[in-house]
């Protein structure tokens, strides 16, 4: 009986039906089987891990399209991540040894890589979150790294993307970042800034030069972060050209105004996109701003189309009778998944960063349990599958 042929046929049949799934709770890359397409386990690369030579790592990962676990690349000597250029899906999982994931709490962590210049995660399409994950894609303290505007757009299609003060390669707009990783405020926004790469925070701000500060706000089109004004003396806050905010502070509302005694005027007349809200549904949450009793028609229409507007201690009808027939489309604005990178969220996570109390008891509690890891095999009886069965039957009869 031709046992070698039978074994070869079984091997091909197995790979055809089930695929090249490899299991390693905390992967030692040099021991990973060849030709893995799916890895069930946690990948750690950097000085804190025992890494084989780069050529071996590249060879072991070149066919990987899906990782069920997490990826941590920290303190590495990589200049790019092209070795993961075929990776399409990362799904967070706590199976096996999860110590590597819990050290950062993210699905994809790329941090403290002093030589890293480019990502080249060109095939990445989907990031699947769970309530255990702090962030989906987390980029921090990679001083030489820049991402393209296209990559930024891809990553902003996901929830829980976090990359404060990221550098942009060959930008077509004026992206403003701070080397000291502070929040933007009334003093440090450069003239002509179109994109803020972190949150705008006016916390206890005194003696604001209103005209000069407003002139800097006029050019801002996007904010990668939130807007927080707390116990400030500012009287007017206008963003005539701001059209998109991606919330890097998920424990705060997108726009948070609290205890500002002089604030009487707010404008968001062009804000039309909030790809990620965070844990609060409110697009604007205001509390204890005694002079802020009215919003313009354009601001009311835009904010109402994005999500709830909450004014504590003021009539909830602050925008009532000031909106036209604009129909709210919150789902569309929140998911932002029209194409490219997609994110599935099982349960929202939390962020340890909080600037102040927002006067609420916290985000609504969600008791949904983590979905257990499962696999679904698609036994499609196509011609190739039948071909192998017929040969197997012929050998044994």
Curated annotation (Swiss-Prot):
SUPFAM superfamilies: L domain-like. The lineage of its organism: Eukaryota, Metazoa, Ecdysozoa, Nematoda, Chromadorea. This is Protein irld-34. It comes from Caenorhabditis elegans. It holds the Pfam family Recep_L_domain. Gene3D superfamilies: Receptor L-domain (3.80.20.20). It comes from the Eukaryota.
């Amino acid at each position: 009986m031709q046992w070698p042929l039978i074994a070869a046929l079984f091997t091909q049949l197995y790979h055809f039906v089930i695929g090249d799934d490899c299991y390693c709770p905390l992967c030692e890359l040099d021991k990973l089987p060849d030709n893995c397409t799916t890895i069930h386990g946690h990948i750690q690369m950097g000085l804190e891990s025992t890494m084989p030579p780069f050529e071996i790592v590249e060879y072991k990962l070149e066919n990987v399209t899906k990782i069920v676990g997490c990826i941590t690349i920290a303190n590495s000597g990589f200049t790019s991540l092209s070795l993961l250029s075929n990776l399409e899906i990362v799904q967070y999982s706590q199976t096996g040894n999860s110590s590597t994931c819990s050290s950062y709490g993210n699905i994809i962590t790329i941090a403290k890589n002093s030589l890293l210049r480019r990502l080249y995660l060109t095939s990445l399409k989907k990031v699947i979150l769970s309530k255990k994950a702090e962030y989906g894609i987390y980029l921090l303290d990679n001083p030489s790294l820049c991402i393209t505007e296209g990559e930024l757009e891809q990553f902003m299609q996901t929830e829980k993307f976090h990359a404060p003060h990221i550098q942009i390669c060959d930008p077509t707009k004026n992206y403003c970042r701070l080397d000291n990783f502070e929040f933007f405020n009334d003093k440090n926004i450069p003239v002509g800034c179109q994109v803020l790469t972190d949150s705008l925070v006016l916390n206890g701000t005194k003696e604001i030069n209103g005209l000069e500060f407003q002139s800097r706000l006029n050019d801002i089109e996007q904010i990668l972060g939130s807007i927080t004004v707390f116990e400030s003396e500012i009287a007017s806050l206008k963003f005539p050209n701001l059209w998109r905010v991606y919330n890097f502070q998920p424990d705060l509302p997108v726009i948070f105004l609290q205890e500002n005694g002089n604030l009487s005027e707010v404008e968001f007349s062009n804000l039309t996109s909030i790809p990620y809200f965070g844990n609060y549904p409110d697009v604007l949450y205001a509390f204890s701003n005694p002079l802020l009793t009215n919003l313009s028609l354009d601001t009311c229409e835009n904010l109402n189309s994005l999500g709830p507007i909450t004014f504590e201690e003021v009539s909830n009808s602050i925008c009532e009778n000031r909106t036209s027939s604009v129909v709210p489309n919150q789902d569309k604005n929140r998911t932002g998944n029209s194409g490219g990178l997609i994110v599935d969220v099982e349960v929202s996570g939390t962020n340890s960063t909080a600037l102040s109390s927002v006067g609420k008891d916290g985000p609504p509690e969600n008791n949904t349990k983590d979905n257990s890891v499962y696999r679904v095999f698609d036994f499609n009886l196509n011609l190739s599958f039948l071909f192998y069965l017929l040969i197997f039957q012929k050998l044994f009869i």
